[in-house]
């Protein structure tokens, strides 16, 4: 490997810049491994400048009519370099309209001398005029003819998420497009499940990045808890909400190591596991991003923190990754005896599994189980259900001319993987194209059966419609003439209804749960859930007594003009029941007094005495100690 980069082996958390040749650019996984061998991962961020002869797309003059369904106005509050950010949904608009808005006097980039001057203006402008971000648009602008570093076909081990579990999460294992303007911001965060990410700036003004080295990530978390105590109390992993902005000045004053780098059009930025990053756009631009994984990530994924309030929880089972790529520790991990320690300093690859042969080992196990072989995903991607606004195809049709790839003979493999623990076994992947969809998974198949495409958990549950396509057909982006752009952006449709989800790799103790809510749609209880063994019971051993002098407040919701109940303002307090075995227990609106017939027995007199002294709530708890609604009154006991 003779690739040129801008600094020697990284020992000081410097953000490295790499200049691969066209030959080196051909193998994405190999080049990422080379970058880590040079210490690029220690900074948490690296830049890759592709060869001059490489192009992601020949031209971008045919994307003006792509629809941005949900533009987000970024409103900030705070002072002294510490701000919180929230989003207001705006009316849908075309990319051409968004470009015109971004270049208008109200939103255009202010005059500046250089990047450093613009950076100072950025932090001084908060709160200021809130910009509008065209973020999280499911789709890709890479042409099918682009084989190297095509974000829709990276071919990393993250493909196992769909191949083994049948799970597609938009923005995680499918690309997202981002149309930005001056001051649009991505707040401090790590990637979902602490994955890698790659960001390509297709065209437009630069993007400035800040990053904290992974080995100092916990220091940033401690500082954030001090600066945002309210958010921290509400959620242990509140940084995953992407609402916290902390300026470089504040980081310096608190001794948090960080680096900055400016990305320009035609350049890639790679973030590494547990690398906290943030940044802003200098003006109108278009970027594309997706997550990916390497064997080194698996240990990070095992211990990745999660949003505890459920607002930004994106998680999936690590079973397939550990079982296939770390078979020597699978049994220990399955019984929660695998004491994983993440080494932020040195890249680690399991000795028994090299990155280059994981696809062959999957094929070997499938062949041993008597299933049809899986088409190699380096040259062919699975068929998925997609939304109408997905991957761009200006001509509106046509089949993908993706060459096939024969699976290599595996008789010389040194070991055979254990069979899948999933209820329906491993999925058969087939089909071509670049299907993208917010939470729409390629349907898993059993041998010899044909099923409809399933919808799996969405990354943020903001999809407004579903569609499907025949195998070999390109999905379509939604254009302005296909929707009414003068209407407000649609809100979430509410709780998703899961159809059949065979092929899921949930823990075995979750697989038989049921029955389904809809008898006409038999379904598994949801994709890739953790085992019930890991769920700690929160029921107290003794139910506290509530004396009659304590007033128990009940939650009352107001009605609208139509007489319907209004939703609570804080939607985070509403428990979203995503799975068929969950049911909502209604809170009673009043307490019924228990009547006791006259009885001369000592037991009856004792019951009457307790009823008078401690009230009906205590009696209800005695009758049924596990009844859930009296437990809601515990906080009122003083």
Curated annotation (Swiss-Prot):
SMART domains with a match to the protein in the record = JmjC, JmjN
* EC code: 1.14.11.66
Q: Provide the protein's localization.
A: Nucleus
SUPFAM superfamilies linked to this entry:
Clavaminate synthase-like
Q: Enumerate the spans annotated as JmjN domain.
A: 15-57
Q: Which UniProt keywords apply?
A: Chromatin regulator, Iron, Metal-binding, Nucleus, Oxidoreductase, Transcription, Transcription regulation, Zinc
Q: Which reaction does it catalyse?
A: N(6),N(6),N(6)-trimethyl-L-lysyl(9)-[histone H3] + 2 2-oxoglutarate + 2 O2 = N(6)-methyl-L-lysyl(9)-[histone H3] + 2 formaldehyde + 2 succinate + 2 CO2
In the record's cofactor note, how is the cofactor described as bound? Binds 1 Fe(2+) ion per subunit.
Summarize where Zn(2+) binds, as residue positions: 235, 241, 307, 309
Q: Quote the InterPro entries the UniProt record gives.
A: JmjC_dom (IPR003347), JmjN (IPR003349)
The record's top EC class is oxidoreductase
- Domain JmjC intervals: 143-309
Which residues does the annotated region (Disordered) include?
Answer: 426-474
Enumerate composition-biased segments (Basic residues).
431-443
GO function term, MF aspect, one: metal ion binding
GO biological process terms, alphabetically, are: chromatin remodeling; regulation of gene expression
What does UniProt give as GO cellular component? chromatin; nucleus
Q: Where does 2-oxoglutarate bind?
A: 133, 199, 207, 242
UniProt cofactor(s) = Fe(2+)
| Residues reported in the UniProt entry to bind Fe cation | 189, 191, 277
User: Is Oxidoreductase among the key words of this record?
Assistant: yes
The lineage's top-level taxon is: Eukaryota
Known function = Probable histone demethylase that specifically demethylates 'Lys-9' of histone H3, thereby playing a central role in histone code.
Please state which protein family the record places this protein in: Belongs to the JHDM3 histone demethylase family.
- In Swiss-Prot or TrEMBL terms, this protein is called Probable lysine-specific demethylase 4F
